[in-house]
Amino acid sequence: MTNIRKSHPLIKIINQSFIDLPAPSNISSWWNFGSLLGICLALQIVTGLFLAMHYTSDTDTAFNSVSHMCRDVNYGWVLRYLHANGASMFFICLYLHVGRGIYYGSYMFKETWNMGVILLFAVMATAFLGYVLPWGQMSFWGATVITNLLSAIPYVGTDLVAWIWGGFAVDKATLTRFFAFHFLLPFIIAALVMVHLLFLHETGSNNPTGIPSNMDMIPFHPYYTIKDILGLFVMILVLSSLVMFSPDMLGDPDNYTPANPLSTPPHIKPEWYFLFAYAILRSIPNKLGGVLALVFSILVLFIFPLLHTSKQRSMAFRPFSQCLFWLLIANLLTLTWIGGQPVEQPYIIIGQLASILYFLIIIVIMPLTSLMENHLMKW
C-alpha cells in the first residue's frame, strides 16, 4: 500500500515540497533564511490579526488604542512588541537572504530571483504602511514625507498624492486605507511566496560551490528540517530577548508622542531597515532625482543576472569579487548610519559618496572585476 503522504492529493504537494524534496548535500546555514522568513511571515500574520482586534483606524483613537493594548489587554504588550520587533527580524533575515543570493550567484535562477525582488518590494510597502498605524509623531511625519515624494512624478504627481491621502493632507482617510492595505498585503505576500517556491522547486536549490548538484542530493527531511529548527531556535532566542529586555531599542522615541500636524520632529527618519534607501534619497538635492535613486536602489537587484560576467556562478572561489561584495556590505552599513544622522556636514558628503559607490560597485566595478577574474583563470 502506498504511503498516504505520497498518494493523498494535498499531502503529496507538502511531501514533495518539504519532506522528499531532493536538496544539495552541501548547502550551509546561509540557506536557513528562507524557512526563517516563512516563520517570520506566519508570526507577523498571527500577531497582526490579534492586534487588529484591538486597534481602531481613526486619527482620534489610533494612538490610544495602541496604548490600551499595551496596558489593558492580557499580554497585549507581548503581541505589540513581537509584531514590531518581528518586522525587524523579518528584514534582518530578508537582507541576509538577498546577500546570500548575491554572494553565491542564486540570482541566475531568474524567475525565482525576480519573484524574490517583487516580494522585497511588497514587504517594504507593508512595513511602511504598518509604521504609520500607531499614529505617533514619526508615523504621521513619515507618512507625510514619503507619500509626498510621489508628487515628484511629472504631470500626475500632485493628483496621485491627493488620491493616496484621500484629501489635502495625511488624515483620517489616509489612516483608514493604510490599515486596510496593511492588513491585506501580508496575504498577497503569502501567495507570492508560493509562486517563489514554485519557481525554486522547478530548478532546485543552488549550493555554495555554484556547481550543479544533481548527482549528489539528499532528502530535505530529516537533514534540513533539523538544521532549519536550529536556525529557528536561534531566531526565537534573539527575538524574545529583544521583546523581553529592550523592546524599544529599534524604535523611535518620537513615536510615543501622539501625531501633531503643527509640530515637526527635529529629524524625520524611517525605521532602521529603510535607512540605507533613505540616505540615498537624501543624498541627491533634487526631489525627482532623489525619488528615482531611491527606487533604483532596490530595482537594481532585477539586473543582477544581466550583470553577471563571470564564468563561475558563486563567489566562493573569486577573491577579488569577495572583497567587492564585503565592500558593498560595508557601504550599505555606512548608508544605514548616514540615514539616521541630521542633514549637515560631514554627513551630507559621506552620504553622497556612499550612494555613488553603491551604484558604481554593482553596475560597473563588479562586472569588470568578474571579467578580470576570467582572464586570471586562464593563466
From Swiss-Prot:
<feature type="binding site" description="axial binding residue">
    <location>
        <position position="83"/>
    </location>
    <ligand>
        <name>heme b b562</name>
    </ligand>
</feature>
<dbReference type="GO" id="GO:0005743">
    <property type="term" value="C:mitochondrial inner membrane"/>
</dbReference>
<dbReference type="GO" id="GO:0045275">
    <property type="term" value="C:respiratory chain complex III"/>
</dbReference>
<feature type="transmembrane region" description="Helical">
    <location>
        <begin position="288"/>
        <end position="308"/>
    </location>
</feature>
<protein>
    <recommendedName>
        <fullName>Cytochrome b</fullName>
    </recommendedName>
</protein>
<feature type="binding site" description="axial binding residue">
    <location>
        <position position="182"/>
    </location>
    <ligand>
        <name>heme b b562</name>
    </ligand>
</feature>
<feature type="transmembrane region" description="Helical">
    <location>
        <begin position="347"/>
        <end position="367"/>
    </location>
</feature>
<dbReference type="Pfam" id="PF00033">
    <property type="entry name" value="Cytochrome_B"/>
</dbReference>
<feature type="transmembrane region" description="Helical">
    <location>
        <begin position="113"/>
        <end position="133"/>
    </location>
</feature>
<feature type="transmembrane region" description="Helical">
    <location>
        <begin position="178"/>
        <end position="198"/>
    </location>
</feature>
<comment type="function">
    <text>Component of the ubiquinol-cytochrome c reductase complex (complex III or cytochrome b-c1 complex) that is part of the mitochondrial respiratory chain. The b-c1 complex mediates electron transfer from ubiquinol to cytochrome c. Contributes to the generation of a proton gradient across the mitochondrial membrane that is then used for ATP synthesis.</text>
</comment>
<dbReference type="InterPro" id="IPR036150">
    <property type="entry name" value="Cyt_b/b6_C_sf"/>
</dbReference>
<feature type="binding site" description="axial binding residue">
    <location>
        <position position="196"/>
    </location>
    <ligand>
        <name>heme b b566</name>
    </ligand>
</feature>
<keyword id="KW-0472">Membrane</keyword>
<keyword id="KW-0408">Iron</keyword>
<dbReference type="GO" id="GO:0006122">
    <property type="term" value="P:mitochondrial electron transport, ubiquinol to cytochrome c"/>
</dbReference>
<keyword id="KW-1133">Transmembrane helix</keyword>
<keyword id="KW-0813">Transport</keyword>
<dbReference type="InterPro" id="IPR016174">
    <property type="entry name" value="Di-haem_cyt_TM"/>
</dbReference>
<feature type="transmembrane region" description="Helical">
    <location>
        <begin position="226"/>
        <end position="246"/>
    </location>
</feature>
<comment type="subunit">
    <text>The cytochrome bc1 complex contains 11 subunits: 3 respiratory subunits (MT-CYB, CYC1 and UQCRFS1), 2 core proteins (UQCRC1 and UQCRC2) and 6 low-molecular weight proteins (UQCRH/QCR6, UQCRB/QCR7, UQCRQ/QCR8, UQCR10/QCR9, UQCR11/QCR10 and a cleavage product of UQCRFS1). This cytochrome bc1 complex then forms a dimer.</text>
</comment>
<dbReference type="InterPro" id="IPR005798">
    <property type="entry name" value="Cyt_b/b6_C"/>
</dbReference>
<feature type="binding site" description="axial binding residue">
    <location>
        <position position="97"/>
    </location>
    <ligand>
        <name>heme b b566</name>
    </ligand>
</feature>
<keyword id="KW-0496">Mitochondrion</keyword>
<feature type="transmembrane region" description="Helical">
    <location>
        <begin position="77"/>
        <end position="98"/>
    </location>
</feature>
<comment type="similarity">
    <text>Belongs to the cytochrome b family.</text>
</comment>
<feature type="binding site">
    <location>
        <position position="201"/>
    </location>
    <ligand>
        <name>a ubiquinone</name>
    </ligand>
</feature>
<dbReference type="GO" id="GO:0046872">
    <property type="term" value="F:metal ion binding"/>
</dbReference>
<keyword id="KW-0349">Heme</keyword>
<keyword id="KW-0249">Electron transport</keyword>
<dbReference type="InterPro" id="IPR048259">
    <property type="entry name" value="Cytochrome_b_N_euk/bac"/>
</dbReference>
<keyword id="KW-0830">Ubiquinone</keyword>
<keyword id="KW-0679">Respiratory chain</keyword>
<keyword id="KW-0479">Metal-binding</keyword>
<dbReference type="GO" id="GO:0008121">
    <property type="term" value="F:ubiquinol-cytochrome-c reductase activity"/>
</dbReference>
<keyword id="KW-0812">Transmembrane</keyword>
<dbReference type="InterPro" id="IPR027387">
    <property type="entry name" value="Cytb/b6-like_sf"/>
</dbReference>
<feature type="transmembrane region" description="Helical">
    <location>
        <begin position="320"/>
        <end position="340"/>
    </location>
</feature>
<dbReference type="InterPro" id="IPR030689">
    <property type="entry name" value="Cytochrome_b"/>
</dbReference>
<dbReference type="InterPro" id="IPR048260">
    <property type="entry name" value="Cytochrome_b_C_euk/bac"/>
</dbReference>
<keyword id="KW-0999">Mitochondrion inner membrane</keyword>
<dbReference type="Pfam" id="PF00032">
    <property type="entry name" value="Cytochrom_B_C"/>
</dbReference>
